[in-house]
Amino acid sequence: MKCCQAAAVAAVGAPKARMAGFYGAVGRRHVNLHRKYEVQQENMRFGMVNETILAIIIAFAISAALCPVVIPFLHRLKFGQQVRDDGPQSHLKKQGTPTMGGLIILTAIVITSLFYIRSYPRIIPILFVTVGFGIIGFLDDYIKIVMKRSEGLNPIQKLIGQFVITGIFTYYLMTSGEVGTEMLIPFTGGFENGYYLNLGWLFVPAVFFIVLGTDNGVNFTDGLDGLCTSVTILVATFFTVVAIGEDSGISPITGAVVGSLLGFLLFNVYPAKVFMGDTGSLALGGFVASSAFMMQMPIFIAVVGLIYLVEVLSVIIQVTYFKKTGGKRFFKMAPIHHHFELCGWSETRVVAVFSIVTAILCLVAYMGL
C-alpha cells in the first residue's frame, strides 16, 4: 500500500518538477535576453560616445587649421568689422578686425557632419536650418562689408529668408512622424516620466516664435570677444550630453558645433583676431533652436539659453522705453553686455560671468531631466 502511495506521489510530482524546470528555464532565458539587450544598448551608447568625441576632434581640427589661413585672407579682402561710434570707447580699437569668421565655423560643421549623415539622418534638418540661417547671415555681412551698405539686408528681406527656412523645418517636424508637436516640460520627470506640452496647431506659430527669437538672441549676444562663442559652446555641450543619453541621433552635429567653436575660440578670445559676424551668429541661433526641437526640448532654451533671452529682451526694453519716454534710456546701452561694460566691467569679466551663469544653468537644466 505504501509502495503504491509513494509511486502515486512520484507520478504527480514528476510533472510539477518538469514544469518548474520549464519555467525556470524560461525565466533564465528571459533574464539572459534582457541582459543581452542591455549589453547591446551599452555597446551602442559606447559607440555613439566614441563617434561624438571623434566629431568634436575633427571639427576642432578643421576650425583651428582654417583660422590661420582664412584670417589673413579676410584681411587682404578688407572684410573688417565696423565699430559703432556711440559704443564703449574700448571697442574703437576693434575697427577693421576681420569678420565673417562664421564661414570657418560653418565649414567645420558641414564637413564633419558629412561623415555621419548616412548613419545619423536626423542631423539633416539641423544642418539645413544651421546652413540656411548662415547663408542669410553671410548675405547680410556681404552687403554691409563688401557693398558698403551699413544696413545690410533690410528687416523684411531677412525676415522672409528666416520665415522660409523655419517654415520648411516646421513642416518636417509636423509630418516626419519623428518629432510631433509635443514639448517636454522641464523638471517634471524627464523624457520617460515627464509631462509634455502638446500645442496642436498652435505648435506652428510657437516654432516660428522660438526659432526666430532664439536666432535674434544669439545674434545680439555676439558683441564681445568670445562671448557668443563661449556661451554657445556650453549650450551645445548640454545638447550633446543629452543627445547621447537619450540616443536621439543628433550627437555628431552637436559635437561638431562644440569642436568647431572650440577651434574658433582660439582666435576669437580677447583680444579677438576674428569675429564670427552674422554669418556665424545667425547660423548658431538656427542650430540651437533646431537641435532643441529635434529633441522636443525647445522650452529648455529658456533655461540653458537664458543669456540669449536676456540679451534680446534688453534690446526690446531699451527700444520700447526710448520711444515711450521721448529719448530716455533704460540701460546705459543695449544689448545688456554693453551696459555692464559702461558700468565699469571689463570685456573679459562680462564674458566670464555670462559663461559661468550659462554653465550653471546647463547643470540645472540637466537636473530637470
Segments from the language model and where they lie:
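Hydrophobic alpha-helical hairpins/lids featuring a short glycine-rich hinge
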Residues: 122-154, 158-162
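Alpha-helical transmembrane segments
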Residues: 44-75, 105-135, 169-175, 181-183, ...
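Membrane-interface helix termini and inter-helical loops of multi-pass transporters
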Residues: 146, 178-194
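Short hydrophobic alpha-helical segments enriched in small aliphatic residues
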Residues: 24, 31, 35-38
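Residue-identity detector for glycine
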Residues: 13, 21-27, 47
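Cysteine-centered motifs
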Residues: 3-4
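Juxtamembrane helix-capping/reentrant segments at transmembrane boundaries
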Residues: 84-97, 148-162, 336-338, 342
